[in-house]
Every structure is written in C-alpha cells, then in structure tokens.
C-alpha cells in the first residue's frame, strides 16, 4: 500500500478493558496496526484506558496515553498532539462510538483530523438500527420483524404486537451488550431500561424471536477500490438463542447447501458495499431450514 503523503501523525484509539464485545483480538489487531504503520514512516499516538495490554508496551507506539476513553479526554489529546488522521476501527465498539461522538461534537473538523479505515457515516449506517433497517430494505434483504423504541413504554407496546418472546438490541453496542431475549413484560422492562442506558443514542430495537434457526456468518474484507473477498464461511453448531461467544462453530460450513452459501455471500457483498465498509466485516445471518427463509 503506498503511503499517503498528506498524513504524518495518526491517532489510534485502543479498545479499553477486555469485556464481552471488547475482547483481546482488538489488542492484537491494534498492536499489529501500530507496528505496520510505524514501518511505513507514520508517527503513532495511541490512547487506551487499559495498561494491561500489548499495544501499550513502550515500543509499540511513538506516544502512548493511558487515559479514560471519553470525548473530553480525547479532545484534549487531539488539541495537544494535532494528529493528521484518526484510526478508530481497531478499538472495537469504544473506538467507533468515540469517533462518532468526536465528529458530532465538531472536534475532528475543528482540528482538521481526517478519519481513515472507516467513514463516519458508515458507522451510522451499520450501528443505528433505523438506518441499518432502511439500508436492508433498499437492498431487498429481509430482516426479522422489528420496531425501534426510545422508551420502555414504547418497547412494551411493540412487544405486545410482535408477541413474546422478543429480542432487544440496543444501538451502538457489540456482542449483545445491554440487550437480550425476554419472555414477559416484567423481563422486558428490566432489560429495555438497561439497553436504553447502554445505547449511545438511547435506542433499542424490539425484534421478533427466531430462536432455533441456524446461525451463519461470513467474514468479508472490502478495500477502498470496492474489491470484496470472503475470508471464511462460519456455521455455528448451536442455533439462534445461544450466544455466539458460547457456541461451537465450524469453518467452512459443513451442513449448509451450496445454494444457501452463495446467497449469503451475495447478501454480504451487497451489505458491505452499501454501508461502505473498508476493512474486515462480520456478517451474521439466520436461516430457517424448514422454510428456507434467510434474514
């Protein structure tokens, strides 16, 4: 990859503490990115709240800050270091959320910091439940029946229409954080309140339950020239309803027909191109082996 001549100093946001959705793979990928970018001649400024990581070792970045990952502290660091670019997508959900918040607050524009590795509007299309749903509708890709709620009261009304059990998915979270499956109104009130608090924008998707369907995934990579490749096809052994972090999986898929795999690949390519993902992306699908429905 040729070096961009308009960039000298790059700010990288670390993933912070190791929790569900913010696991050690982000530390590994962030460390490799720091090393690769430094070899290309870039100066690296790293911000991470977790000192117990490889990426915060003294020889990984040129300048390392062990600071809380929030907008105020990032703004202070940007003001002091004046990076030319921000690389947020190696910090997991924390990095993506902070990038969106910094952009919305006008910090990136004020200090002339360009975002590399991902576009800010791509984060919104992928993370905001309404935007993502509209994008899928334009592509003709079916999704589970769902509605967005901004309060517990709204969620209760939607769940009554969809019928219990339902799944709650907070926006701008990863790994199921703050959400879950609920079987009655009492559970919904507790989980929805937690999900609204966990969501960056106070938004929760109330979705029909499709437990028991096959859970299938594709890892795809797209570059800036719109070239897309499939890294692997993944078949979860346990059905939908069991968290992927607790499920065995096989790569490649062993029991899924070639026709279904081709359809999943077609959908994945449409999705990453529509959202304009640059880099790696995990696309998750549910497949009903009885009806053949894919969402």
Regions picked out by a protein language model, each given a short descriptive name:
Residues 1-295:
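N-terminal beta-alpha lobe that positions the nucleotide/phosphoryl donor
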